[in-house]
Amino acid sequence: MTWVLASSSPRRKELLAQAGFTQAQFQFVQVSPDIDESQLALETPSAYVTRLALEKAQAGLALSRHLPHPKVIGSDTIVVLDGQLLGKPTDPQDAERMLTSLSGRTHTVMTAVAITNGKRALSRLCQTQVSFTSLSQQDIAKYVATGEPMDKAGAYGIQGLGGCFVSEISGSYSSVVGLPLVETRALLAAMMEQDDTL
């Protein structure tokens, strides 16, 4: 059996290592699946992020067929403000627009995690409320100039410099970083338990 993380994210790699520490000799490899992340018509944010996590796990499985009995973990994170998705910014101006919209407001971070072994798939969704302090245009410009926002949903990283903007969080910190630890541990255990009953 081989655990596989369908993500190249160093943040998710670190979090998965934490989530699996209670599993005997927990080790995993990483693959980088490429999927179409377009939102479907009328798809809710929660349905969208859950679908992407499942599709990443399934695409990761396709890249892991050479491994013995792969179990693949996929995850996706989105930021939702006023019902609108804030994905990764397309350019610095887009990052500035997103950060301006988040300034002084509370938004929802949704992270879905999914595990598949090809025969079954399990998933969980975690929602966390994050409040930003009010940001000046200078704050935003300096932050965008660091480059940190460019590969992150909502144009900020709570575990990095962007954490300076967070005034309050209600929910899972690790989920905002990219992989909810409690939910991931539960899925790892559930997948192991199902295998034991076969």
Swiss-Prot record:
SUPFAM superfamilies: ITPase-like (SSF52972). Keywords: Cytoplasm, Hydrolase, Nucleotide metabolism. It catalyses: dTTP + H2O = dTMP + diphosphate + H(+); UTP + H2O = UMP + diphosphate + H(+). Its EC number is 3.6.1.9. Its cofactor is a divalent metal cation. GO terms for molecular function: dTTP diphosphatase activity; UTP diphosphatase activity. Its main location: cytoplasm. The record marks 11, 77, 159 as: Important for substrate specificity. GO terms for cellular component: cytoplasm. The active site is at residue 76. This is dTTP/UTP pyrophosphatase. It comes from Shewanella denitrificans (strain OS217 / ATCC BAA-1090 / DSM 15013).
